[in-house]
UniProtKB/Swiss-Prot annotation:
Record keyword Nucleotide-binding present: yes
Membership in a protein family: Belongs to the AAA ATPase family.
Reactions catalysed according to its record: ATP + H2O = ADP + phosphate + H(+)
Residues noted as binding ATP in the record, renumbered to the chain: 384-391, 698-705
SUPFAM superfamilies linked: P-loop containing nucleoside triphosphate hydrolases (SSF52540)
Name of this chain's protein: Peroxisomal ATPase PEX6
CDD domains to which the protein is assigned, alphabetical: RecA-like_PEX6_r2 (cd19527)
Domain of life: Eukaryota
Cysteines paired by S-S bonds: none
Gene that this polypeptide is encoded by: PEX6
UniProt subunit comment: Interacts with PEX1; forming the PEX1-PEX6 AAA ATPase complex, which is composed of a heterohexamer formed by a trimer of PEX1-PEX6 dimers. Interacts with APME9.
Keywords: ATP-binding, Cytoplasm, Hydrolase, Membrane, Nucleotide-binding, Peroxisome, Peroxisome biogenesis, Protein transport, Transport
Length: 941
């Protein structure tokens, strides 16, 4: 049965109503109507949960005229039952209070009729919060254009009203108290729809008090507003111009937008933030941050802050351009709403999710008002190799928290006098305070490790470091409750809770560096947290490449999955910056190729009259796809060359088992060590220490290096080759640092094989080197420390060493857990073994029919190594090439069966080459290596 509406009480019936209700006792229950001292009817209060109200201006169900009449900065949506409970109508004004913080604002009520529900079906009108959409994990969300059910115990606020009530602070505080797991989900969120079905605990609800306004606020006679400073552009949007004419035009757009905005009554208070929409584009060639900014819903909004209103003794006032004189001028610092609060964010979460979660857990608590947070000093040192995405992570976290980001390069802070560096650093903090609350991002912070190096005095270096540390420590302290800015003091009508919004941590310091090594301990102690960022793993690279290549995958002549798998394997160790450069390079080459192919098709269609251009494009379709793949491969090769370093860049060699002749026993032993942990990781998940080190020893030229490359190729591993002398440096500590860098580079390119060639020169027995500084002893100790960390089954890192003299290597490297698997790679006197080696070396040769590799192998000396047989094959091919050149010079005409570009190697060429070649090993030397094999045979396993 439909409930009867309450009678409308008019002023003329006041005396009659007083006489009727004079004998009744007024009720104090929430939601009941009571009488004030004058006998007027009072409407009840309501305590509700906070929600977010959204609508799309391009929707089909609501006209633009109706949307324009709504005050999006002060709007609250209620159900019909709540309107009856409060005895108000749609369009009435209510006072909304954040119970936790105590901030109050006046808002206009709009009724939200539940779609697809009727009053007869009362059970459907009560929908739990957990079954609705959620904003910021906490706020139930209602979309005017949607068809979801309505929660009867929720007041749905417009995003700007929620921000002015500091509900985002209450939400963040709730998430922090619920633990890091919930906080991580908040920073992973991309849109409201991700939280369908998420349970909302009772403790996570944000409480509101709603009270009908007994008297409509009066009009403000004067209103003063200022632009909110945005450090990304360095200035307000109206000044992002190239000429005075353009500046006047843009200022006119802002004035007209404000005139239209205040064409309807707006409920404002001092300190409120409101925004206007202007459809424009910066277009300035000097504004790089604007040109690089992602396109999103918030780019066309300009934010303003209410500085002063008249009359000043009124807390809430109405503003209308026909009743209020508007003064616009200056800029002011203020935070902006978090991106998830005001719109559905289109910015994807960075690939380094772990770093995002750690940084969020550090920066979120200081933003929550509490006695403990106001005493904590927060400063973060974020370090990682250049291009790993440090700035991207910082900006993403700042958007989620509603903070500005002010960037400075520490190179610009280094003055001619190092004593002035601390002064320049203090000025950057003062600059950042102009945009508070903000994150001050000091890039290239590791330049401070060179302070005082010119003077060379230890006392001067300590003094400069102490000055830098004093500035950081002093300026990262939170503002005490006794401190306040001039702006806060002038706004004496603010409540104590509202003033508290502008105190606390005005500037949060984040310093980014490539490495923390070399930075003075005095400076490092100023940072409360140090966070390290690594490189991308296979899944992260695959995700980034998939997103980047969505538009060009149709041009590739192989399936997307197959191409992506190979590309991910070839980009091991690539950073986000490297991947972006790779895709940009390939895209530029692909565009040029497509342009040239289009010209060919057009010329072909002109020559073939009557043939359609589409048909002509089908003729050359396969060529286009092949060209696109080749362009991408070339871009990958160029990218690898750019990333190559002095110590060698990780790469995947192109050496197959077919290139290695013989050595079947050694192949099997290496595969058991390397391939088994990769294919069956579950077997090693129980904590068993895997054997990840192999030492190949034997005479030179027996194929130790070739064997290591073949293992890396067949197991799809990256290959990092290290020559011993490359790591030795004359400066103290640099050699050990080079060893650490090698293992760090390999970890970033996992799965990876580190190949130490000539290991005996890099890690000789300690105490026997005789160098005055003990450099080699420290290098060996550093290698032992790094290798001991490879036993973890999750490392996917393997080490292979090669040496001619294993007896010179430090014995500690040969114990189990390090280079514990010793494999002898020697010379085999069996003719069939040498035949397999010759087949591998000549598999790309064009041999004559009279060539018998077994006969050639039998004629080879018994001390021939793999290198000797490679020289034999190379000399034989050279003999055949000279014979072909001689025939060409003599004028002999080749037969039809002969290929003019091929060289045919005959049996006699091998014999001539063998006569001119002597073995690289003698019988005596070979016996010495066999004695070494017998000595270490007991350690072989």
């Amino acid at each position: 049965m439909v409930e009867r509406r309450n009678p409308l009480v008019l002023s003329s019936t006041r005396s009659t109503l007083r006489s009727v209700l004079n004998s009744s006792q007024p009720s104090s229950a929430d939601g009941d109507r009571v009488l004030n001292k004058d006998g007027d009817l009072l409407r009840g209060n309501a305590r509700l949960s906070a929600g977010i109200l959204r609508w799309r201006k391009d929707g089909e169900n609501v006209s633009d005229a109706k949307l324009d009449s709504l005050d999006d900065s002060a709007l609250v949506g209620l159900s019909t039952q709540l309107l009856k409970r409060l005895s108000i109508n749609s369009g009435s004004l209510v006072v909304v209070k954040n119970i936790e913080i105590g901030i109050q604002r006046v808002a206009q009520v709009v009724v939200l009729d539940p779609p697809k529900t009727t009053l007869e079906d009362a059970s459907l009108t009560q929908v739990p919060v957990s079954d609705s959409l959620h904003t910021m994990l906490v706020f139930p969300t209602y979309d005017l254009m949607g068809q979801q059910l309505l929660d009867q115990e929720v007041a749905y606020l417009s995003p700007m009203l929620a921000f002015n009530l500091s509900l985002h602070i209450s939400c963040l505080k709730s998430l922090v108290h619920r633990g890091n797991g919930v906080l991580e989900k908040y920073f992973e969120a991309k849109c409201d729809e991700e939280f369908i079905g998420k349970s909302a605990e009772d403790g996570s609800k944000i409480g509101l008090d709603l009270e009908p306004v007994s008297q409509v606020p009066g009009y403000a006679s004067h209103l003063r507003v200022s632009f909110v400073k945005i450090p990304e552009c360095g200035t307000i949007p109206s000044l992002k111009v190239n000429s005075s004419f353009e500046a006047e035009e843009r200022q006119g757009l802002i004035d007209s937008a404000l005139q239209k905005y205040f064409g309807t009554d707006r409920q404002l208070s001092r300190g409120d933030i409101f925004r206007i929409y202007i459809d424009w584009n910066c277009g300035s060639s000097i504004c790089n941050p604007c040109s690089q900014r992602l396109c999103s819903e918030s780019d066309d909004y300009i934010y303003f802050k209410v500085i002063a209103m008249e009359p000043s003794n009124e807390r809430f006032l109405r503003v209308n351009h026909s009743q209020t004189a508007l003064v616009l001028g200056g800029t002011v610092s203020s935070g902006l709403p978090p991106d998830l609060l005001v719109y559905r964010s289109k910015v994807p979460m960075p690939l380094q999710e772990e770093t995002v979660n750690i940084l969020a857990s550090v920066l979120s608590p200081p933003l929550c008002p509490s006695a403990l947070a106001s005493k904590l000093r927060v400063a973060v040192l974020l370090h990682g190799i250049p291009g790993c995405g440090k700035r991207t992570v910082v900006k993403y976290v700042a958007r989620r928290l509603g903070l500005h980001v002010v960037e400075f390069s520490c190179h610009s802070l280094l003055a001619s006098s190092e004593r002035k560096t601390s002064t320049a650093l203090a000025q950057t903090f003062n600059m950042a305070r102009r945009y508070s609350p903000t994150i001050l991002l000091l890039r290239h912070f590791d330049v401070f490790k060179n302070l005082g190096s010119q003077d060379g005095s230890l006392g001067d270096r300590v003094g400069v470091s102490f000055e830098i540390a004093s500035v950081i420590r002093e300026l990262t302290e939170p503002v005490s409750n006794g401190d306040s800015s001039m702006e806060e003091k002038s706004n004496s009508n603010f409540s104590e809770n509202e003033v508290g919004k502008f105190r606390g941590h005005q500037v949060l310091l984040i310093a980014s560096a490539e490495s923390t090594e070399g930075i003075s301990p005095t400076i490092r102690r100023c940072f409360s947290h140090e966070i390290r960022m690594g490189s991308l793993n296979d899944e992260q690279r695959s995700e980034m490449l998939s997103q980047s290549l969505q538009g060009v995958s149709q041009f590739l002549n192989i399936s997307s999955d197959e191409f992506m798998k190979g590309l991910v394997g070839q980009t091991s160790g690539f950073l986000p910056r490297d991947l972006q450069a790779l895709v940009a390079d390939a895209g530029a080459n692909l565009y040029i190729s497509q342009e040239s192919e289009t010209k060919k098709i057009n010329s072909l269609s002109d020559d073939l009259h009557g043939v359609d251009i589409h048909q002509a494009s089908q003729i050359d379709n396969s060529t286009e796809k092949l060209t696109a793949k080749e362009d991408f491969t070339k871009a990958l090769d160029r990218s690898k060359k750019r990333n190559a370093s002095a110590l060698g860049a990780p790469k995947v060699p192109n050496v197959k088992w077919d290139d290695v002749g013989g050595l079947e026993d050694v192949k099997t032993s290496i595969l058991d060590t390397v391939q088994l942990p990769l294919l069956h990781k579950d077997l090693f998940s129980s904590g068993l220490r895997k054997r990840s080190g192999v030492l190949l020893y034997g005479p030179p030229g027996t194929g130790k290096t070739l064997l290591a490359k073949a293992v890396a190729t067949e197991c799809s591993l990256n290959f990092l080759s290290v020559k011993g002398p490359e790591l030795i440096n004359m400066y103290i500590g640099e050699s050990e640092k080079n060893v650490r860098d090698i293992f760090e580079k390999a970890r970033s390119a996992r799965p990876c094989v580190i190949f130490f060639d000539e290991l005996d020169s890099l890690a000789p027995a300690r105490g026997a080197s005789g160098d005055s500084g003990g450099v080699m002893d420290r290098v060996v100790s550093q290698m032992l420390a790094e290798i001991d960390g490879l036993s973890d089954s999750s490392q996917d890192l393997f080490i292979i060493g090669a040496s001619n003299r294993p007896d010179l290597i430090d014995p500690a490297l040969l114990r189990p857990g390090r280079f514990d698997k010793l494999l002898y790679v020697g010379v085999n006197a069996d003719a069939s073994y040498r035949e397999r080696v010759l087949k591998a070396l000549t598999r790309k040769f064009k041999l004559s029919e009279d060539v018998s590799l077994y006969s050639v192998a039998k004629k080879c000396p018994s001390t021939f190594t793999g290198a000797d047989m490679y020289a034999l094959c190379a000399d034989a091919w050279f003999q055949a090439a000279k014979r072909k050149v001689s025939k060409s010079d003599s004028g002999d005409m080749p037969t039809e069966e002969d290929d003019p570009d091929s060289v045919v190697v005959e049996y006699v060429d091998f014999i001539k080459a063998m006569d001119q070649l002597s073995p690289s090993l003698s019988i005596t030397e070979l016996k010495k290596y066999e004695m070494l094999r017998d000595q270490f045979q007991g350690r072989s396993s």
